Structure formats: structure tokens, C-alpha cells
From Swiss-Prot:
InterPro entries: Mab-21-like_nuc_Trfase, Mab-21_HhH/H2TH-like, MAB21L/cGLR. Keywords: Developmental protein, Differentiation. It comes from Caenorhabditis briggsae. This is Protein male abnormal 21. Belongs to the mab-21 family. The lineage of its organism: Eukaryota, Metazoa, Ecdysozoa, Nematoda, Chromadorea. Disulfide bonds: none annotated. It comes from the Eukaryota.
Length: 364
């Protein structure tokens, strides 16, 4: 697979035009089904609790703002909440990948739309809002309108719904933070690298991030430090999908799309720690190693695929994968050792075939 010749270009384009496009078409169809169901659920939720307003919208291109695709069978719908203004955003690095929303000095609790979810210390609790939202969704899904094809998964406190017994969608409450950049990511972009250029870096920072209410590695497992666990449960997890997507265009996005296809076919199993998000993270790191545009042209995409997969093998062997913007956050944290070891074997088998078989993409 390694090398720069017309055979590589042909294989890359054939794989992309056939398997990647087939995957995209299937995902697009699934997204429309998921979005329709989520909008119906949120309509009923809003009727019971007007503060949870449906923010899922379809664009002129047929895409849905607020839907994140984790795999062809796993999705996330982001519900953006209103009125964060009376809170200060505090990102001091105390809780990895998270920040807290603290009532501004001089502000009264009664000035907030979310008054009953504010802790005694003045923090807006992500856990309390999530608990309230989950209870309402549970009530909605028990009605005849939804009970035949929707089921609330209650294996944790996230609001996860099984649809048609085929798809899982997590509905996540979040605050949108445009135009600000988290302190935990202040090191980015790294000095001295030509990628991204100044204009792209500034656009990426202006995109901002989301503060989401979700379970994290600490709250999902028994933590001996109860106070730390409670603090993290009340904190909001930072998600930076918009900023990441701004950096991945052209050949970079094409590389990621091919990797997603390869993951679905060769690295997916129940409980796999290798998510599409980890692949996206490693592509971003690969961008820093290969800054020039020509390095992401079709003739070089074979090398980029191998490079990312070798990074993945290394991460799995070290049992650590640092978040691209928030390096203190380990994306493999708390993942079972046996699943990491199995993923390492599957990934190495895949990358070995890509390296030694000049026609690998034709058979994968």
C-alpha cells in the first residue's frame, strides 16, 4: 500500500466512491429516521417542561444541525439550552475535559432560568439537569405513541434511546459557547507549526465549543474520592466537534471517511474502545506531522491511512489517547484492558495488510 503511484490513487478513489459513499448514504437515511423520532420526543418533552426547547433543525442541504454520527447505528442529538448568561464559565483544569458554570457575583439564584438546578455552592449542576430531563423522556416514552418502537436505556444516567431496535441515540443537553476558547486548550495551535495557518486557527477558535451534560469516566465507575466524583457529576463536559470539523476538509476529511469505513468493517465489536472520535483525534495529530496540502492528496492518502493506524496501535499499547485540544483528557480512560488488547490486535492486523499488500483496499 505504501508508495506514490497510480495504483494507490485508483484504489483510494474506488474505495471512497463505492464503500465510503455507500456508508454515507446509509447514514444519511438513518439520520433522517433518528431526527424525526427525536423531534417527536422533544415536542412532547417541551409540552411538559418548556425550558427544554427543541433546537434540532434541518438545513437547506438536508443535514440536521445538532445530530452527531458516532457509527451507522449510534447517534447523538444535542439539545441546546437557553440562558447561560448569569453564570461564569470556569475552566481551571481541576476536572479533566470539564468546566463548571458558577453563578456570577452579585447574581441571585432567582435570576436564572435553571434556579432549582443550582447547587448550594452556586454551581449549575449538569447532573441535576440531566436527571430531570431523563425523567421526562422516560414518561414520554411510556406513552402508546412511542412505546412500540422506542425504549429508554437505563444502564447509566445519560439519556439514551433505542429506536426500532436498531439504532441508539443519546439526547444530550448542552450550552453553546461561541466566540470563546477554553483555557485548557490555550496551548493550541502549537508554536512553529505551519498548520493550521493563522486564519484557520482563528476561525477554529471563534467556532467555540459545547458544554454538555453527560457521564464521564469518573462518574461511570466507583470512585473512592466521593467529593471529586460529585464535583465531576455537576461539571459540564467540553465537546469541540465544530472546531474539529473546521480543521478537517478536503483530503483530510477523505482520509477520515475511509478510516471510519475500515473501522466499521474490521475494528468494530461490542464494547470496542476504538470510536470514530478517536480516529478523528488521530487524524488531527497526523495533520500536525504532515502540514502541507500535497501530503493529503490522493497519491499520499495511503501513507496517511497507515500513519494514523500506527498511531492507533501505539495508543492502544500505551492504553492512552490524549484529546487533541484538551490533552489532559484521556479518551481511553477506564476502558477495559481486554477490549483495548483485542483492538490492538485487530488494528495491527489491518495496518499490516495495508503495508504489505499493494492491493489491500480492493479486498478490505
Amino acid at each position: 500500500m505504501l508508495g506514490h503511484n497510480q495504483n494507490v490513487v485508483y484504489q483510494v478513489n474506488t474505495f471512497y466512491n463505492e464503500k465510503v459513499q455507500q456508508r454515507k448514504a446509509r447514514v444519511t437515511k438513518n439520520v433522517h429516521r433518528i431526527a424525526k423520532v427525536v423531534q417527536e420526543i422533544l415536542k412532547e418533552v417541551e409540552a411538559q417542561e418548556p425550558r427544554f426547547i427543541n433546537t434540532l433543525t434541518e438545513t437547506s442541504t438536508g443535514r440536521f444541525d445538532g445530530i452527531v454520527v458516532h457509527s451507522p447505528s449510534e447517534y447523538e442529538a444535542v439539545l441546546y439550552l437557553n440562558q447561560m448568561g448569569v453564570f461564569n464559565f470556569v475552566d481551571d483544569g481541576t476536572i479533566q475535559g470539564c468546566a463548571v458554570l458558577k453563578l456570577s457575583d452579585g447574581r441571585k439564584r432567582s435570576m436564572s432560568l435553571w434556579v432549582e438546578f443550582i447547587t448550594a455552592s452556586g454551581y449549575l449542576s449538569a447532573r441535576k439537569i440531566r436527571h430531570r430531563f431523563q425523567n421526562i423522556v422516560a414518561q414520554v416514552l411510556q406513552t402508546p405513541q412511542f412505546s412500540e418502537y422506542c425504549k429508554l436505556l437505563q444502564d447509566n444516567t445519560d439519556v439514551r434511546v433505542r429506536v426500532d431496535d436498531k439504532y441508539t441515540v443519546q439526547i444530550t443537553c448542552a450550552f453553546r459557547c461561541n466566540g470563546i476558547w477554553p483555557r485548557s486548550a490555550s496551548h493550541w495551535p502549537l508554536a512553529g507549526l505551519p498548520w493550521p495557518n493563522t486564519a484557520l486557527a482563528n476561525q477554529t477558535k471563534a467556532e467555540g465549543f459545547d458544554l454538555t451534560s453527560r457521564e464521564t469516566a469518573i462518574t461511570q465507575h466507583n470512585n473512592p474520592n466521593k467529593q471529586a466524583s460529585t464535583m465531576e457529576a455537576d461539571a459540564w463536559a467540553m465537546k469541540m466537534h465544530g472546531a474539529e470539523n473546521m480543521l478537517l476538509t478536503g483530503g483530510r476529511q477523505k482520509t477520515l471517511s475511509i478510516l471510519k469505513c475500515l473501522r466499521d468493517a474490521h475494528m468494530d465489536f461490542p464494547g470496542t474502545p476504538v470510536t470514530n472520535y478517536i480516529l478523528k483525534t488521530l487524524v488531527l495529530y497526523e495533520c500536525e506531522k504532515h502540514c502541507s496540502e500535497y501530503e493529503w492528496e490522493d497519491t499520499n492518502i495511503g501513507d496517511r491511512l497507515v500513519g494514523v493506524l500506527l498511531q492507533l496501535v501505539s495508543c492502544l499499547q500505551c492504553r492512552r489517547c490524549a484529546h487533541y485540544f484538551l490533552p489532559s483528557l484521556d479518551l481511553l480512560r477506564a476502558k477495559p484492558t481486554h477490549t483495548i488488547e483485542h483492538s490492538a490486535k485487530l488494528t495491527w492486523h489491518l495496518v499490516r495488510k495495508l503495508m504489505i499488500d499493494p492491493n489491500a483496499l480492493q479486498t478490505l
